[in-house]
């Protein structure tokens, strides 16, 4: 799966990922205080069940929720605040606030508030609106293990095409999930089905594994180094000379071409040459659009004169990044996981988590191409 999240090659876009000021008063006459009053009102009947210490704790959590909600509204959805007059939005606010009052978990507070901010911003009766409402219902029931498993499953279906340094950051961004992946149980897997986040396709599973997809998508990254004769030919072709660990370019060579070559090829560890980008097709397409057909020829030569990694070598690449990938890859090979598919609300919840981990914006559309 791929999402157009553009990768720069000296101005050429070729990168992809394969998936909240004061008091607010707007035209509807609703202020920040009104929003707090609305939230307090819609959960008042539920709050009445608490006694003594539990009552004080619940009130404190509700105050924390309201404070975070107002802050995010001011930052991200000031123009939409009037929607809190609608019954549908008040019902969503009731469920979100109550979810945090019950758990008291800081992450839950952030998740519920963010969901409510998104809910304010979407069109009523849209598919996105129904997904958000369902997510607000489901999220309180998901244990940390279930939420991390769901997020990892969504991550495992993506392929990122970018600079290798960006790809490595992307892989490393989910280390907090990997560190706990061994705690996932069969009960967690079954519960995701019960919670309507996933479903089983018994007897059917994808023929391509996570490793297959990475090997296919990152076909420049997962290759062995080129032979010395490629290096010599490359330096001779571009008339590059070395002097005291400094590269000298021929007089009259265009600055744009020099910068492009340095952008794509890692020449630091001569006589070894490495690629700085993950994907053959995206690099070649970007260079062709810039008119660098001679550099495209270099990429083709590099590709043809290097051997791809085996699946086992790709696995070792990930395990070297984080030993917990051993558990993660074993998990992905389990029959119960291979036949598991994410439902739309599961994809939605997982995408929101992945944005926090990776920093990449992910569209739901990448899972439905």
Put a short name on every predicted segment.
Residues 125-163:
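Short alpha-helical segments that sit at the start of domains
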Residues 28-81, 85:
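Hydrophobic face of amphipathic alpha-helices
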Residues 186-205:
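A short, conserved structural fragment
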Residues 162-170, 201-210:
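Short acidic alpha-helical/loop segments enriched in Asp/Glu that coordinate divalent cations
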Residues 167-184:
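Short helix-coil junctions and helix-kink-helix linkers
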Residues 210-338, 342, 346-362:
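Short, amphipathic alpha-helical interaction segments positioned at domain boundaries
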Residues 1-49:
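Long, low-complexity intrinsically disordered regions enriched in small/polar
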Residues 87-140:
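Long, low-complexity, charged/polar intrinsically disordered regions in eukaryotic proteins
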């Amino acid at each position: 799966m791929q999402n157009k999240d553009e990768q720069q090659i000296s101005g050429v876009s070729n990168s992809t990922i394969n998936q909240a000021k004061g008091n607010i008063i707007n035209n509807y006459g609703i202020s920040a205080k009104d929003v707090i009053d609305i939230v307090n009102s819609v959960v008042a009947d539920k709050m009445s069940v608490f006694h003594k210490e539990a009552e004080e704790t619940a009130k404190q959590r509700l105050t924390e929720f309201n404070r975070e909600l107002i802050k995010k509204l001011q930052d991200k959805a000031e123009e939409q605040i009037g929607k809190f007059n609608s019954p549908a939005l008040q019902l969503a606010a009731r469920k979100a606030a109550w979810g945090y009052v019950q758990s008291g978990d800081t992450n839950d507070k952030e998740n519920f508030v963010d969901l409510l901010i998104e809910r304010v911003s979407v069109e009523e009766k849209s598919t996105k609106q129904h997904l958000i409402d369902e997510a607000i219902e489901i999220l309180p029931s998901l244990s940390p293990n279930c939420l991390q498993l769901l997020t990892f499953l969504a991550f495992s279906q993506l392929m990122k095409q970018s600079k290798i340094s960006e790809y490595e950051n992307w892989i490393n961004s989910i280390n907090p999930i990997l560190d706990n992946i061994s705690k996932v149980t069969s009960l967690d897997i079954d519960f995701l089905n019960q919670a309507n986040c996933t479903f089983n396709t018994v007897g059917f599973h994808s023929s391509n594994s996570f490793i297959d997809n990475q090997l296919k998508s990152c076909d420049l990254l997962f290759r062995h180094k080129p032979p010395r004769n490629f290096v010599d030919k490359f330096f001779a072709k571009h008339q590059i000379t070395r002097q005291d660990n400094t590269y000298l370019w021929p007089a009259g060579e265009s600055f744009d071409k020099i910068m492009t070559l340095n952008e794509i090829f890692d020449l630091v560890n001569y006589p070894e040459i490495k690629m700085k980008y993950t994907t053959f097709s995206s690099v070649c397409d970007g260079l062709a659009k810039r008119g660098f057909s001679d550099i495209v020829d270099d990429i083709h030569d590099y590709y043809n004169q290097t051997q791809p990694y085996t699946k086992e070598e790709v696995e070792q690449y990930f395990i070297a990044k984080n030993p917990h990938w051993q558990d993660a890859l074993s998990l992905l090979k389990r029959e119960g996981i291979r036949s598991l598919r994410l439902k739309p609300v599961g994809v939605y919840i997982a995408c929101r988590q992945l944005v926090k981990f990776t920093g990449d914006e992910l569209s739901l559309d990448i899972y439905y191409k």
